[in-house]
């Protein structure tokens, strides 16, 4: 219970005053503690220089009654007014002073009433506290008395003085000097492209209609694709968070929270993995350690790992990680370590002692480094240890079975021998319930029981301080608690569709709801660790800010380590993460990209946003009342309630809530839904905060886990639980696409939710990306395949509801359409070669109109790109790498995805592109060795063909010009220019085929020879050898 300040009985005369109390509006605390009024006759704009200063505060002072039981400034004699003014420290004549008091101290007549009310929270009355104690007052100033400045509990009264209400986040608009020209150039280029296409259509090339037709179709599609891509970029914004304000609101002593215990909501962190052979357990363990050591209230944090393969190797690696976390987590807190992934921390090249103040840091770091090296040895030795254990137990079982068989068969073994199942064993001598090394029925990747193990229990509510340990670290005064951690592997059985990663995530959503029920869920891949220990708090600033209850998720940018310095294949993808995503943040929000995303649990459950307001307009910023679909229970309400639009969506008004057909038959799970919704609300500490919760509502301890709770959590991850429910259809991660992340985010936006893009000063998360060309192309192939699936499904943005904003709809439409650009891109890459082969061109002649349009389009595109680079903060080299890989991926992976999608939709045929050969790196110590490995795949065929065809075309074009009677060198250069444009974009691809030191695989020579012969035969057919007198290239 919060202790209250001493109370005294108010004068009955003062309580009977009919007029509202007068108050000082605005003040500034001086160095001596005195607060000076800054009120003036005119209203002060608090949004200027004063609003952000810590020494300016809003406060309300109740003015005591005058001796005749009338408030100051009421009607009375002049002498009384003057006397009262003089006693307050003022001067001047009576009537003048009385009028000034009315102007300066009256709150009810001020237009800044909201400024005063916004700092009043709860039922705590600072006015009564001030004037029922020994506080002093005066005209234009107020201060606390020096004596008795604390009350029972030892908290200073000044700590509870009304402070200015501070938002937790703010929008940082792109400067108009950058954004306005950017928008203007987009409009100008749009007009130029329109007139260029009109000119191209009305001026066909009669000499080569087939070239003209192919080119004009491609150019129209490119214009359409460019519009889809550029329109969502019209309103980019930046955002900033205020972690100090978050700390003051949720973790500082207050009247509702006198102990300063954290009032932040709970967060559940999900880590997903499936195969320890492809995703090394050491990498997953380091990710887990970075989560357990994150800077967030320990009792509010829970971590879960979803092992969809049910591997004992992952299970025991996580157990080892939890044991190491007992030292690693307090070490990070003691010395404020960043990053808190031990492998990344010990790999940092800079001085580790920088900014470290504790004298025992070097000793502690040396000790924990030695412990981590031993931890790595144990993790790396787990596969062999588990196999040896299995062999020992299996041998024991075999001897046991033979002994039993001899006893039953008269002392001899049966003729058929004794069969003993080669099982995988746990350390306690029991069978591993998951996947065995030698798969058997009930023990394979697609057929095993559900597993749930609480490896780290629910921490105590109060901090547990460590002490000095001989031979270990000194954790005196350091909280040594570790957040709760659970290993989860859902049940899998033949005949059930497990829906890959999306199904595993939904299983964790249900299990975590029963075990911890964090109001927010952070989703990470096993190779993405927390690089910024305050990342969760950064995201919480948006969720807990005014209007945060309408945010469904916070998407963080993906940052990668281990990328080659030149970023040959655009692995950093900064154009997308710093450009496109930042622009979408100015609309309805960024798309969900699969990792580094913090969800509102309530939004994952398929509910609409809490306030039924729809936004219209180009940028989705204009509010308009939404169209409500009222149920019978809502229609039966009183007319008064019908006329008044509710700001929230009451859970008990949803007729489907809790029904098995929607969420399943677990009542324990459905009971957690309203709790998660309530805990995810922002604080109601401002008059403009709607659907908020009172301060101090989340201070109660979490109950310990008991056997029935764990049993229920196991039940909700069973393979049959989702049967006849809406999981995967409207609830949780959505099924039916290999890019379930994009579809899941789309469904939330389609219901009216908003998302936010959070770019932190220090990267929030970091992960790994494939630097090998083949692996990179297969990654892009998976993304593009998912986009094609979206285009041919009900998740196409063309079928979205009106809650999806216009430009957001355009962005999602582009997500489904962009792979189809590959068809036209491939054709356009062959056009320069076809022009050189045929001696024709896409236009009748290179006249002034064509060259002028080409120049204007090129200049405007360059200027738009430069301004985009400016507001997004990406580098020119990054932009160029992205352009290069756009062409490489567009002519390979995107084209393959379109072929796959069309065959699947039209004929029901599924084609997969897999690796056919692998090579190993020559230098295992080279971290970029994988960059030089050449793994042949069918995705190489089209880009390789484009390169060879254009090279041969240049040779043929040059030969025709050299041996012609009248060489046309200028025309040849014009034809070669477009081929070189293609080849320049293909340079990283060609360099990747060379491998290390230019070693080209034999298969590349084979394909080059085949393509060259084919092209030569084609040229001979088109242009017979005896025609050597023609001009070489383009006819003018």
From Swiss-Prot:
Protein name: Cellulose synthase-like protein D1
SUPFAM superfamilies: Nucleotide-diphospho-sugar transferases
Enzyme Commission number(s) from the entry: 2.4.1.-
Keywords, comma-separated and alphabetical: Cell wall biogenesis/degradation, Glycosyltransferase, Golgi apparatus, Membrane, Transferase, Transmembrane, Transmembrane helix
Stated family: Belongs to the glycosyltransferase 2 family. Plant cellulose synthase-like D subfamily.
InterPro entries: Cellulose_synth, Nucleotide-diphossugar_trans
Disordered, as annotated region: 1-99, 626-665
GO cellular component: Golgi membrane
Pfam families recorded: Cellulose_synt
Membrane topology of this protein: Multi-pass membrane protein
Record gene name: CSLD1
Biased composition (Gly residues): 86-95
Source organism of this protein record: Arabidopsis thaliana (Mouse-ear cress)
Function: Thought to be a Golgi-localized beta-glycan synthase that polymerize the backbones of noncellulosic polysaccharides (hemicelluloses) of plant cell wall.
Residue stretches of biased makeup (Low complexity): 631-642
Transmembrane segments: 178-198, 208-228, 817-837, 848-868, 895-915, 938-958, 962-982, 1002-1022
Biased composition (Polar residues): 9-19, 69-80
GO-annotated biological processes: cell wall organization; cellulose biosynthetic process; pollen germination
Source domain of life: Eukaryota
An MF annotation (GO) of this entry: cellulose synthase (UDP-forming) activity
Gene3D superfamilies: Spore Coat Polysaccharide Biosynthesis Protein SpsA, Chain A (3.90.550.10)
Main location as per UniProt: Golgi
Subcellular localization, as worded in the UniProt entry: Golgi apparatus membrane
Active site: 308, 741
């Amino acid at each position: 219970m919060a202790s209250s300040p001493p109370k005294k009985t108010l004068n009955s005369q003062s309580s009977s005053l009919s007029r509202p109390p007068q108050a000082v509006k605005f003040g500034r605390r001086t160095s001596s503690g005195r607060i000076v009024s800054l009120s003036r006759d005119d209203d002060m704009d608090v949004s200027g220089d004063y609003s952000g200063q810590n020494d300016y505060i809003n406060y309300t002072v109740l003015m005591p009654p005058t001796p005749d039981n009338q408030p100051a400034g009421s009607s009375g004699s002049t002498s009384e007014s003057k006397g009262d003014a003089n006693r307050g420290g003022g001067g001047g004549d009576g009537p003048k002073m009385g009028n000034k008091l009315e102007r300066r101290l009256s709150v009810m007549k001020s237009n800044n009433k909201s400024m005063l009310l916004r700092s009043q929270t709860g039922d705590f009355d600072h006015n009564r506290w001030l004037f029922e104690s020994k506080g002093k007052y005066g005209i234009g100033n107020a201060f606390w008395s020096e004596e008795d400045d604390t009350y029972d509990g030892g908290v200073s009264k000044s700590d509870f003085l009304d402070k200015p209400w501070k938002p937790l986040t703010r929008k940082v608009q792109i400067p108009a000097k950058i954004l306005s020209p950017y928008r203007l150039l987009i409009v100008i280029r749009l007009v130029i492209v329109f007139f260029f296409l009109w000119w191209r259509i009305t001026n066909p090339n009669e000499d080569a209609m087939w070239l003209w037709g192919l080119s004009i179709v491609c150019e129209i599609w490119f214009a359409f694709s460019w519009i889809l891509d550029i329109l969502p970029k019209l309103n980019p914004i930046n955002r900033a968070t205020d972690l100090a304000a978050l700390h003051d609101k949720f973790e500082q002593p207050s009247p509702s929270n006198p102990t300063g215990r954290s009032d932040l909501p709970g967060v559940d962190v999900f880590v997903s993995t499936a195969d320890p052979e492809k995703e090394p357990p050491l990498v997953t363990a380091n990710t887990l350690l970075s989560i357990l050591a994150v800077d967030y209230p320990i009792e509010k944090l829970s971590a879960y790992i979803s092992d969809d393969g049910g591997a004992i190797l992952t299970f025991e690696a996580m157990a080892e990680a939890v044991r190491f976390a007992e030292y690693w987590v307090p070490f990070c807190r003691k010395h404020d370590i960043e990053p808190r992934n031990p492998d990344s921390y010990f790999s940092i090249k800079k001085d580790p002692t920088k900014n470290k103040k504790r004298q025992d840091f070097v000793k502690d770091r040396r000790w924990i480094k030695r412990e981590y090296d031993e931890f790595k040895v144990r993790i790396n030795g787990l596969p062999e240890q588990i196999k040896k254990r299995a062999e020992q137990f299996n041998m024991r079982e075999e001897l046991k079975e033979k002994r039993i068989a001899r006893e039953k068969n008269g002392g001899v073994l049966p003729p058929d021998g004794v069969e003993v199942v080669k099982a995988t064993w746990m350390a306690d001598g029991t069978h591993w319930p998951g996947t065995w090394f030698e798969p058997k029925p009930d023990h394979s990747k697609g057929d095993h029981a559900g597993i749930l193990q609480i490896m780290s229990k629910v921490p105590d509510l109060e901090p547990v301080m460590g002490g000095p340990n001989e031979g270990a670290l000194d954790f005196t005064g350091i909280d040594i608690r570790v957040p709760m951690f659970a290993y989860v592997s859902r049940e899998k059985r033949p005949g059930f569709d497990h829906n890959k990663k999306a199904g595993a995530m939904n299983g964790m959503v249900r299990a975590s709801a029963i075990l911890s029920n964090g109001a927010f869920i952070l989703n990470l891949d096993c190779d993405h660790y927390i690089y910024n220990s305050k990342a969760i708090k950064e995201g919480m600033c948006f969720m807990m800010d005014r209007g945060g209850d309408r945010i469904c998720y916070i998407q963080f940018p993906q940052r990668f380590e281990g990328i080659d310095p030149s970023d040959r294949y655009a692995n950093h993808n900064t154009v997308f993460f710093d450009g496109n995503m930042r622009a979408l943040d100015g609309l309805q929000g960024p798309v969900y990209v699969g990792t580094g995303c913090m969800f509102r649990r309530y939004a994952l459950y398929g509910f609409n946003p809490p306030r039924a307001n729809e936004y219209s307009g180009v940028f989705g910023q204009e509010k308009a009342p939404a169209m409500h679909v009222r149920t019978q229970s809502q229609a039966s309400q009183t007319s008064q309630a019908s006329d008044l639009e509710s700001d929230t969506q009451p859970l008990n008004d949803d007729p489907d809530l809790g029904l098995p057909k929607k969420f399943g038959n677990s009542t324990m799970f459905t009971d957690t839904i309203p709790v998660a919704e309530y805990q995810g609300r922002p604080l109601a500490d401002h008059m403009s905060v709607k659907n908020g919760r009172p301060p101090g509502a989340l201070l109660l301890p979490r109950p310990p886990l008991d056997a029935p709770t764990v049993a229920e959590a196991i039940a909700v991850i069973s393979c049959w639980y989702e049967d006849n429910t809406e999981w995967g259809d409207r609830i949780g991660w959505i099924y039916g696409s290999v890019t379930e992340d994009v579809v899941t985010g789309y469904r939330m936006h389609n219901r009216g939710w908003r998302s936010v893009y959070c770019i932190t000063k220090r990267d929030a998360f970091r992960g790994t990306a494939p630097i090998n060309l083949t692996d990179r192309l297969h990654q892009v192939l998976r993304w593009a395949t998912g986009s094609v699936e979206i285009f041919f499904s009900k998740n196409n943005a063309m079928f979205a509801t009106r809650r999806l904003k216009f430009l957001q709809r355009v962005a999602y439409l582009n997500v489904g359409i962009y792979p189809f650009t590959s068809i036209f891109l491939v054709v356009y890459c062959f056009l320069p070669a076809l022009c050189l082969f045929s001696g024709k061109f896409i236009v009748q002649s290179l006249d002034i109109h064509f060259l002028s349009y080409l120049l204007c389009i090129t200049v405007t595109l360059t200027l738009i790109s430069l301004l985009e680079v400016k507001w997004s903060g990406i580098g020119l080299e990054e932009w160029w790498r992205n352009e290069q890989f756009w062409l490489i991926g567009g002519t390979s992976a995107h084209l393959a995805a379109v072929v796959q999608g069309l065959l699947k939709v039209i004929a029901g045929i599924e084609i997969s592109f897999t690796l056919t050969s692998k090579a190993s790196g020559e230098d295992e110590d080279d971290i970029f060795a994988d960059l030089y490995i050449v793994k042949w795949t069918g995705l190489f065929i089209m880009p390789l063909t484009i390169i060879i065809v254009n090279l041969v075309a240049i040779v043929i074009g040059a030969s025709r010009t050299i041996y012609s009677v009248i060489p046309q060198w200028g025309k040849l250069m014009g034809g070669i220019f477009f081929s070189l444009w293609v080849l320049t974009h293909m340079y990283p691809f060609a360099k990747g085929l060379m491998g290390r030191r230019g070693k080209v695989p034999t298969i590349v020579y084979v394909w080059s020879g085949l393509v060259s012969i084919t092209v030569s035969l084609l040229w001979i057919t088109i242009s017979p050898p005896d025609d050597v007198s023609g001009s070489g290239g383009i006819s003018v």
